[in-house]
Amino acid sequence: MFLIAPEQVTANESLESFLIRLCKANGFESYQTMALVIRDWLQDNDHEAAGSWPLTLSRANIYHANHSSGFRVRAFKLLDELLDTNSPSMLERCLLNTTTAFSPNLASVSQRNIIIPLQFIRTLIIPVCPQCLTEHQYIPQLWHISPYEACHHHKCELITHCPSCNEPLNYLQAERMTHCECGYNLRLINTIKAPTVKKVISEYIAGKDVDCLPLRADMSERFGIILWYQNRYLHSKSDDDSSLISFFEHWPQSFFEELDDLSKTACDKQLKSFNKTDFSVVFGDVLASCQKLPFRTPQQNIVLEAVVDYLISLVEKNPICKVANLGDLKLNIIETATLLSTSIEQVYRLIEEGYLQLAIKLKLHSRLSPNQGAFYLRQAIELRQSRITPTYSNNMTYLPSW
């Protein structure tokens, strides 16, 4: 069996778009027709891989195959052998499952070592840029990512609905990239200039440096920054990102002012001693929400870096004294692990070896509850300051394994 590769093969094309063009280049009427032929060929060459081959285009990507992803990887590798091209492999186009999570425990996918929050992957509506479709008839992977709402090449808004039938656009259903299911030619649509905030976010996600957002070389970090902002400040789909630019233009001072307000409110409304008050009562999920974006160390996580800097300053401004202050707030084990840029297992080791003292008394043979305030903020900060975070690691190890 032999397959002719489509023309204009580029690295930024989505897997599904490439499969549609592969169908056309080889004379198949639909993806399902081609999928059945490929599955029959795989059955003769590797029956395990054949069983994992997707028959529906919308389920073709590897991240959809939770239990058979290994076999599907093998299937795509075999498919590469049928193509007469030196273009990027099928696996390079795939979105892969990954064990890396974004806080607070949000799933992610990976492509070419870039970690993307799963919630950013569009499934129902996949917008298009008519000008791009006029220049090249394929769908870039960027159009599948939800914060990308403006074409960074043409500075126009992406089109989400067909102007003829008003139905949402999704080329995975129609298996046509330049036309809607109703037959309307999407290349004829007049585009609208994108608002500044949409243009800036789209350029940022596309890898361009923009002055008003943090300059981070790692694309995974950029996705983490956008995700953190949306989860913290945008509480419904009707909210927009208009304040994002002004927020990060004054980073980290804008964030510090917010934390200062929380500190002041806690002091004004204090009901019990701070050494009996949980950190989350004063600052909410400020630590838990930035634990992994997707990295744990401040060098690769600007939000955690800002939080750590603020808390160090807070402890310095509130030295230990007879009356408990904000430096004596109680952290739970998850917050402590976040502040120390390490794992929960390492925190337990630090307790066992006496580096961390519990602020509470545990019953014999009992285990700490994840949400139970058990460590003083001051002590965790001092322990962190006593260690140097290695720049090559995504996780600090305070003690070697047993």
Residues covered by each model-derived region:
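Basic, alpha-helical nucleic-acid-binding regions used in initiation and control of genome expression
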Residues: 1-402
